[in-house]
Amino acid sequence: SLSDKDKAAVKALWTTISKSSDAIGNDALSRMIVVYPQTKTYFSHWPDVTPGSTHIRDHGKKVMGGISLAVSKIDDLKTGLFELSEQHAFKLRVDPANFKILNHCILVVIATMFPKEFTPEAHVSLDKFLSGVALALAERYR
């Protein structure tokens, strides 16, 4: 679980990086479909699933909107992300293992875009936070 120190670190990092959240989402999703091509199956209804395509950019923006929501609900991720969990479990039917894959890609992108801000301490806190987000999103699968 997230300590008060972790929560403060996530909020501080988010304040800095949120201005670039659309680019982070696009890059993370683009990276995910290249490095983990099996994830493309969830987007097979899109006409263009190439990195940086309009659909990838738009969905990356949605993903980062969800992360922004999670930051605002950091004290109770399970309740705060309930609707997103329902959507991913019952409508989109996303395998929850993919949340961890995307989290890894988000961490890589933030590390490359914000090397100064992405200290080891920020890394640990953000990793724990994203793991909590993945757990909250997987809640409705049980």
UniProtKB/Swiss-Prot annotation:
- Residues binding heme b: 88
Identify the SUPFAM superfamilies for this entry. Globin-like
Q: What is this protein called?
A: Hemoglobin subunit alpha
Protein family according to the UniProt entry: Belongs to the globin family.
Positions bound to O2:
59
GO biological process assignments: hydrogen peroxide catabolic process
Record-listed N-acetylserine modification sites = 1
List the Pfam families: Globin
In its miscellaneous comment, the UniProt entry states: This fish has two hemoglobins: Hb1 (major) and Hb2 (about 5% of the total). They display the Bohr and root effects.
Ranges for domain Globin = 1-142
